Regions:
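Solvent-exposed, well-ordered amphipathic alpha-helical segments
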Residues: 41-42, 60, 100-101
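Short, solvent-exposed beta-strand/turn "edge" segments of beta-rich domains on protein surfaces
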Residues: 50-56, 108-112
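Acidic-leaning, charged glycine-interspersed low-complexity segments
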Residues: 82-131
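Small/polar-rich, solvent-exposed N-terminal microdomains that initiate assembly or binding
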Residues: 1-53, 71, 75, 89-93, ...
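Oligomerization/assembly interface segments of phage tail-like spikes and tubes
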Residues: 55-69, 73, 80, 115-126
Length: 131
C-alpha cells in the first residue's frame, strides 16, 4: 500500500510539479525543502463476505502538506485533493478525501511561519497475494 500511494502521487503531473520527490512516509528527512508531503497510515479496515476476505484494503491515510508560504500550501492542497477525489485506477478501487484541516506553526519561513494542511483520505486498495 505504501508504494502504491506514493507512486500515484509521484506520477501525477500537478502534484509532481509542486512537490517533486518530496513525498515521504512517516517523517521527512532533515532539511527537506518546502513544499513537502508527509504521509501516515491512520488505520486499515478489512471487510469479509461469507466466502472470506473481500480483497479490498480500506486505508485511512493522513497526508500533511507543509509549505513556507500560504500560497504554496494551498496549491499543494488543491493538487493533492484533485488527485485523490474519486480516484479509481488499476490498483485502487476508490479514493475519497474525507477531512481537510489547516494549521500554522512557527518556523523559519519567509514570514516566520510554516503552513500545513492535513488531508484525511480513504484509499481502497485492491489487495493481491504478492503484496
Amino acid at each position: 500500500m505504501h508504494a502504491v500511494v506514493r507512486n500515484i502521487m509521484l506520477a501525477d503531473a500537478s502534484v509532481a510539479a509542486l512537490l517533486g520527490q518530496n513525498i515521504h512516509w512517516s517523517d521527512a528527512p532533515a532539511n527537506s525543502p518546502y513544499p513537502l508531503a508527509v504521509l501516515q497510515k491512520v488505520s486499515e479496515r478489512r471487510s469479509y463476505t461469507l466466502e472470506g476476505d473481500d480483497g479490498l484494503g480500506r486505508h485511512l491515510v493522513q497526508i500533511d502538506l507543509y509549505a513556507s508560504e500560504h500560497r504554496g500550501m494551498r496549491q499543494a492542497s488543491q493538487a493533492v485533493c484533485k488527485l485523490w477525489s474519486g480516484l479509481r485506477s488499476a490498483g485502487v478501487a476508490g479514493a475519497f478525501v474525507q477531512n481537510i484541516r489547516e494549521t500554522v506553526e512557527r518556523d523559519t519561513g519567509a514570514d516566520g511561519l510554516l503552513y500545513r494542511v492535513s488531508l484525511d483520505v480513504l484509499i481502497i486498495i485492491k489487495e493481491t497475494s504478492d503484496e
